[in-house]
Amino acid sequence: MSKIPSVNIKALLDAGVHFGHKTSRWNPKMASYIYGERDDVHIIDLRQSVALMSVALNAIYETVKKDGKILFVSTKIQASDIIAEYAEKCGQYYVNHRWLGGMLTNWKTIAGSIEKLNKLDKTLENEEALMGYTKKEILNMSRKKDKLLLSLAGIRNLNSKPDLLVVIDTNKEHIAINEAVKLNVPIVAVVDTNSNPDNVDYPIPGNDDSIRAIRLYCSLFADAALQGLEESMKASGVDMGAMQEHTDKGLTSKNVSKLKQTKKFSKTKNIDEETNTEFEQALNDADENKNSDNA
């Protein structure tokens, strides 16, 4: 039986997930996810991060298990390569450079751009066809192809709307989120202390700037998707040895209903005692280490 990945307080602390933004930059809607503040920086309540990450990973797992498609989105510099790496690892789709307005809500136009990209690819790979073009024309075609690839490389095999959107940095990717909301596509997102969690179905309180944190999130997301894929293949009677080949081709579309979940775990009774104790101890240890360094 497949096991959905899990994460603990220590792993989140080591990745710097608990560091929010300066208190002056916070979004009051994130109040219930904030533990406190240290040196004018908000500290995220990692007890809730652990609990809500589990809910989000289950959503990813269930989506892929039911042959759904996931679109990973983050166009910020520090996340761009990581998003592409892990989306490809689990055979899903991604946008990691620029979100083109209408990528979800005006799919017909985007599909037309993908068709142009595929035609350019076909032409540039055909040596015989290239003999009919000048060097300048070939150079222009190559430039057009490279420009299209920046925005479309991760979705060129996506033939319909995704079943789940996974976002890092909701402020930067607000257009993608708005389009997903219009189409009733569920959203998993890392929400930092300056974020608005309102339209996020599966919020994960955490730092959305640290490269270590982003890599940790994406690794967990990809592992959950791969576990879902494994279950999907077993149910279909597919040879597990062929799983990687299947992944490379992408998944077929199927509507996946939103999972019931609780967004906020502000009451300690919703957090197991072991996680609560671990978080409190970790913060105390951090304070003691800081005090000893300053002594």
Curated annotation (Swiss-Prot):
Against NCBIfam families, the record matches this protein to: rpsB_bact
Note the coiled coil stretches, chain numbering.
Answer: none
Taxonomy, superkingdom: Bacteria
Q: Does the keyword Ribonucleoprotein apply?
A: yes
Q: What are the entry keywords? A: Ribonucleoprotein, Ribosomal protein
Q: Which gene encodes it?
A: rpsB
PROSITE patterns this protein is in? Answer: RIBOSOMAL_S2_1, RIBOSOMAL_S2_2
The terms under GO molecular function for this entry are: structural constituent of ribosome
Under the heading InterPro entries, the entry gives:
Ribosomal_uS2 (IPR001865), Ribosomal_uS2_bac/mit/plastid (IPR005706), Ribosomal_uS2_CS (IPR018130), Ribosomal_uS2_flav_dom_sf (IPR023591)
Q: Where in this protein does the record put region Disordered?
A: 247-295
| Protein name as it appears in the record | Small ribosomal subunit protein uS2
The GO biological-process annotations, alphabetized, read as: translation
